Swiss-Prot record:
Plays a role in the initiation of viral DNA replication. A dimer of E2 interacts with a dimer of E1 in order to improve specificity of E1 DNA binding activity. Once the complex recognizes and binds DNA at specific sites, the E2 dimer is removed from DNA. E2 also regulates viral transcription through binding to the E2RE response element (5'-ACCNNNNNNGGT-3') present in multiple copies in the regulatory regions of the viral genome. Activates or represses transcription depending on E2RE's position with regards to proximal promoter elements including the TATA-box. Residues 221-230, 268-278 have a biased composition (Low complexity). GO terms for biological process: DNA replication; DNA-templated transcription; regulation of DNA replication; viral DNA genome replication. The keyword Transcription regulation applies. InterPro entries: E2/EBNA1_C_sf, Nucleotide-bd_a/b_plait_sf, Papillomavirus_E2_C, PPV_E2_N, Reg_prot_E2, Regulatory_protein_E2_N, Regulatory_protein_E2_N_1, Regulatory_protein_E2_N_2. Keywords: Activator, DNA replication, DNA-binding, Early protein, Host nucleus, Isopeptide bond, Phosphoprotein, Repressor, Transcription, Transcription regulation, Ubl conjugation. This is Regulatory protein E2. The gene is E2. There is a cross-link at residue 304 (Glycyl lysine isopeptide (Lys-Gly) (interchain with G-Cter in SUMO)). It comes from Human papillomavirus 30. The keyword Cell membrane does not apply. Residues 1-200 are annotated as: Transactivation domain. It comes from the Viruses. Belongs to the papillomaviridae E2 protein family. It is found in: Host nucleus.
Length: 378
């Protein structure tokens, strides 16, 4: 068991080093996926021996270990193949070759520089869905790896694979899921594509109009789409979105009374007129809460950065447990579309926080925001 623990530690140290180095070379990402593969092999072997924990890490079931190892092998082999081409000299981030990107449509391809477009179903702006158009798609075909752009037309989003169009998003299928009338509009920056009548009423195989192809320029900044009249806009529009039913019953008066009383009780416990209120993370105002006649505030540090780097830092912080009281898991704000996440570190006093910041090495790519919180469980 000790041998397995040592091998697991070695694999995880290598993985963390790859996160911290933030390399843009394919050969370094091959090393990362080899380490992930070996990590899951060690966990698989441990589970075979009925070991459910290696030190503090829970060992997943055999099926999970096997599935993760297979994904690591698949991506590692694809990268080793791509490394033999002229594309190896390009910049490749760990995000470009991560598992999520590999399984994002079009699957089993590498992709770069995605830009979002909007598709309005039934001509309604409030019934819209976002899709990604990739500036470059790298696929392995009959002649090895090829780099092509993805393209938008009224049928969907596609790329050309060995001379054939491969649609990885079909707007006709999406209209069945999200709309009622089978019509849609595609909005890309200040350009729009409208669905012909023949497409909205028949399957794509029966369509023979002149194709209007727009190759989306992914370097353009996204602008507000222009207002336009959709195909079939004069038809009666449905008032509800698919899968949602309007609420027709009035809330129980007893529940309403209870909710009002609870809100009033909470408002009485929070003193919003206190002059010590501060501006906190995300632009919200932090209020000092009065508890037993005094203000109980706890010093904290919010760390902002890419999720993998934050997880790496949190792992490293376990060596300095004496310098903080608690540390959160990785989280993000739900009302923003950003790739950054946060972790929060709680301290018993200002001195402990200062010691933490002096001792723990925090990478420059992670932003440090200091503040205070109330009502924190110590």
């Amino acid at each position: 068991m000790e041998t397995l623990c040592q091998r697991l530690d070695a694999c995880q140290e290598k993985i963390l080093d790859c996160f911290e180095n933030d390399s843009k070379k394919i050969e370094d990402h091959i090393v990362y996926w080899k380490a992930v593969r070996h990590e899951n092999v060690v966990l698989y072997k441990a589970r075979q021996n009925n070991i459910t924990k290696l030190r503090h890490q829970v060992v997943p079931c055999l099926q999970v270990c096997k599935a993760k190892a297979c994904v690591a092998i698949e991506i590692q082999m694809a990268l080793e193949s791509l490394y033999k081409t002229e594309y190896k000299v390009e910049e490749w981030t760990l995000k470009d070759v991560c598992e999520n990107m590999w399984h994002t449509a079009p699957k089993q391809c590498f992709k770069k520089s995605g830009k979002r477009i909007e598709v309005w179903f039934d001509g309604k702006k409030d019934n819209r869905t976002e899709y990604v158009v990739w500036q470059w798609v790298y696929y392995c075909g009959d002649n090895g790896w090829t780099k092509v752009p993805s393209v938008v037309d009224y049928k969907g989003i596609y790329y050309v694979h060995d001379g054939n169009k491969v649609y990885y998003t079909d707007f006709n299928d999406e209209a069945v899921k999200y709309g009622y009338k089978g019509t849609w509009e595609v909005h890309m920056g200040n350009e729009s594509i409208y669905c012909p009548d023949s497409v909205s009423s028949t399957l794509r195989s029966n369509v023979s109009p002149v194709e209007t192809v727009v190759e989306y320029n992914t370097y353009n900044t996204y602008q507000t789409p222009t207002t336009s009249t959709p195909v079939g806009a004069n038809e009666a529009a449905s008032s509800a979105r698919p899968g949602k039913r309007p609420r027709t019953t009035e809330p129980d008066s007893t529940d309403t009374t209870r909710q009002s009383a609870a809100r009033e009780s909470h408002a009485n416990r929070v003193n919003t007129n206190n002059t010590n209120n501060r501006q906190c993370l995300g632009g919200a105002t932090c209020y000092n809460t009065e508890v037993d006649g005094g203000y109980k505030t706890t010093p904290v540090v919010h760390l902002k950065g890419e999720p993998n780097r934050l997880k790496c830092l949190r792992y490293r912080c376990q060596k300095h447990k004496h310098l903080f009281v608690n540390i959160s898991s990785t989280y993000h704000w739900t009302n923003t579309h950003t790739e950054y996440s946060y972790i929060t570190v709680v301290y018993k006093d200002e001195t402990q926080r200062a010691n933490f910041l002096n001792v723990v090495k925090i990478p420059p790519s992670i932003k440090i925001v200091m503040g205070h919180m109330t009502g924190v469980d110590m």
